[in-house]
UniProtKB/Swiss-Prot annotation:
One of its GO terms (molecular function) is cobalamin binding. This is Vitamin B12-binding protein. It is found in: Periplasm. It comes from Yersinia pseudotuberculosis serotype O:3 (strain YPIII). GO terms for cellular component: periplasmic space. The keyword Disulfide bond applies. Belongs to the BtuF family. The complex is composed of two ATP-binding proteins (BtuD), two transmembrane proteins (BtuC) and a solute-binding protein (BtuF). It holds the Pfam family Peripla_BP_2. Residues 1-27 form the signal peptide. The keyword Transport applies.
Amino acid sequence: MMPLGLFPLPRAAAVLLISLLTLPAQAAERVISLSPSTTELAYAAGLGDKLVAVSAYSDYPESAKKLEHVASWQGINVERILALKPDLILAWRGGNPQRPLDQLAALGIPIFYSDPTHIDQIASDLDKLAQYSPHPEQAHQAAEQFRQHVNTLRDRYARSQPKRTFLQFGTQPLFTSSGHTLQSEVVSLCGGENIFADSRVPWPQVSRERVMTRKPQVIVVSGTQSQVDNVSAFWLPQLVVPVIALNEDWFNRASPRILLAAQQLCQQMASIPTPVAESH
């Protein structure tokens, strides 16, 4: 058989072909999502109408708020999940406890795991979900649009002068992100340089002194303007740099909406004057 790659196809035709190749014998009919991010992925992939239950804080889109909750920070309600008879469970590998998931898998329930550490993996998850969706073309189109948006941001901000960026999560204790997280990738996408990218653990706890020695030029947090005020006050008087607050749900969820946070960050980073080169 001639490899498909030898004959370039129009984009729309390629998406349709992928949809046909990945269409399962029977799409999922009863889906349960165990995290807010996988709930958003389900809707983006055309599985929203098939959701029968979700996790706490699954609040986007609006229709997700009407669904029953079977998971929270306290754990997973295995008994209730079994009563709902799902034929697909969407799980967050980094956030859901593994033991109840193993129990559910042992009973023959298919489990789709999502835990992207690279921004392009969100598009890959959408492509993979197409095999379970009654509308696989919607999943592939969402993945393609996501990739296009990422590439647009990369092209637009690739030549930006890097700004040393501190990703701040909390104050007491003070946590940040290594270079192996989605949040760090968003910073890089916008021309930022994560000052703790070299950390060996994904979410290191750091001291005030360690942050100061790395001389950040901008601080990025998730939250509202009040968070900006609190963080600015926390660092005074030793550190006076711009603080950018990003929509918490956009920035912290591994879903297509993370690109809204990226756009928000890129625009604000670009408006910050590049500091005069420091003498060494």
